[in-house]
Amino acid sequence: MALSKEDILTWLEEAKTSEVVELITAIEEKFGVTAAAVAVAAGSGPASVDAEEQTEFDVMLMSFGDSKINVIKEVRAVTGLGLGEAKALVEAAPKAIKEGVSKADAEDIKKKLEAVGAKVEIK
């Protein structure tokens, strides 16, 4: 009697972990393969690109809160913009303050802006 792929998958869903481990060990011995090599090969396709951790972040000023002047000063310090440009950026919230920065830099900028009363999100 031949088992169908569906029968095998059903058994795997219902089997105990120890039974699955025994099956994997038997397959490794019988066919001279290792499960680690199969796992690496399965994860090396285009689907693994989606699983990668995000490396670039955008710092978004959602609102300037009660202390607009202090937020403008901090935006100037973080971005290097002039007074008028920083003021326009703050007044245009929600707006990106910095784009494509590392996670550490984004967290640092967020902390500085929140310290002066701004509402900030990292995307």
Swiss-Prot record:
Cellular component aspect of the GO annotation: cytosolic large ribosomal subunit
Keywords: Ribonucleoprotein, Ribosomal protein
One function term, GO molecular function aspect: mRNA binding
Pfam families linked to this entry: Ribosomal_L12, Ribosomal_L12_N
GO BP terms, alphabetized: translation
Domain of life: Bacteria
Subunit structure: Homodimer. Part of the ribosomal stalk of the 50S ribosomal subunit. Forms a multimeric L10(L12)X complex, where L10 forms an elongated spine to which 2 to 4 L12 dimers bind in a sequential fashion. Binds GTP-bound translation factors.
Known function: Forms part of the ribosomal stalk which helps the ribosome interact with GTP-bound translation factors. Is thus essential for accurate translation.
Recorded family membership: Belongs to the bacterial ribosomal protein bL12 family.
Matches recorded under PANTHER family: 39S RIBOSOMAL PROTEIN L12, LARGE RIBOSOMAL SUBUNIT PROTEIN BL12M
Name of the protein in its database record: Large ribosomal subunit protein bL12
Name of the gene encoding the protein in the UniProt record: rplL
